Amino acid sequence: MASLREIQMRINSTKSTKQITKAMNMVSASKLNRAQAHSAKFQPYMLKMQEVLGTIANGTTGASHPMLEKRPVKKTGYIVITSDRGLAGAYNANVLREVYREINEKHTTDSYVLFVVGKVGVQFFRSRGITVTDAITGLNDSPSYVDVAEIVKRTVSAFTLGEIDELKLCYNHFMSVISQEVKVETLLPLGEIEASSSTTYEYEPSEEQILAELLPRYAESLIFGALLDAKVAEHASRMTAMQSATDNADDLIGRLTLVYNRARQAAITQEITEIVSGAAAQQ
């Protein structure tokens, strides 16, 4: 049985760990609120662009663009969004497992390319000998479009230049504080864009020119929007994980304290027994 000193050291160590996890939980809660606000501010821009493009794409003029049209798929691009840090529960494992399963089941080595956001994702693929075509790491907790513009434009241009025939977006979608859903969505070709209203517009210059200008921006906005959504999911997952760790620390401290008290009581009983036995032996 462990000594009283060893048990007390374990209790103190667990209390120190609890302080850290509790602090991380509070920090993640604060970051979650900011990330949600940041994501919400971006939504009106994306919805308005969807409204305009949907009106053109679904109109009667027959305006079209290569980004809207399907073509035979010889190579697929994957944008995989992960975090730079761990301690976020199954946040990274879930999306990486899904992407890894899909590329193993559906692709040969030269029929896909990976664009990865986050150190965890980069390390995951490289440790398995999988080439990462492009990556970005070190994003802050509320990234701006400028922070990710290079990789976003690179992925969209890979499709428009014919380097890939479809582009998939893989990330964790925020459902609630305790729930995130892994999404693997086909981003390009865009397919049908639903108009969010019945508003009609007159366009200058032509609708084809507007599509050519706005469709790449719309695709880029979808990627950035998914990144903001994933950031919200990351903070929520980390907050939940740290709360769970704090609760587990409380349980462990309670059990160790019970063991400590029993051991202390046993030690006291042993001392009393020895004193009584010694006194009896002297009589």
Curated annotation (Swiss-Prot):
Its main location: membrane. Produces ATP from ADP in the presence of a proton gradient across the membrane. The gamma chain is believed to be important in regulating ATPase activity and the flow of protons through the CF(0) complex. GO terms for biological process: proton motive force-driven plasma membrane ATP synthesis. Keywords: ATP synthesis, Cell membrane, CF(1), Hydrogen ion transport, Ion transport, Membrane, Transport. This is ATP synthase gamma chain. HAMAP family: ATP_synth_gamma_bact. The gene is atpG. It is a peripheral membrane protein. F-type ATPases have 2 components, CF(1) - the catalytic core - and CF(0) - the membrane proton channel. CF(1) has five subunits: alpha(3), beta(3), gamma(1), delta(1), epsilon(1). CF(0) has three main subunits: a, b and c. It comes from Exiguobacterium sibiricum (strain DSM 17290 / CCUG 55495 / CIP 109462 / JCM 13490 / 255-15). The lineage of its organism: Bacteria, Bacillati, Bacillota, Bacilli, Bacillales. Belongs to the ATPase gamma chain family. It is found in: Cell membrane. It holds the Pfam family ATP-synt. One of its GO terms (cellular component) is plasma membrane. One of its GO terms (molecular function) is proton-transporting ATP synthase activity, rotational mechanism.
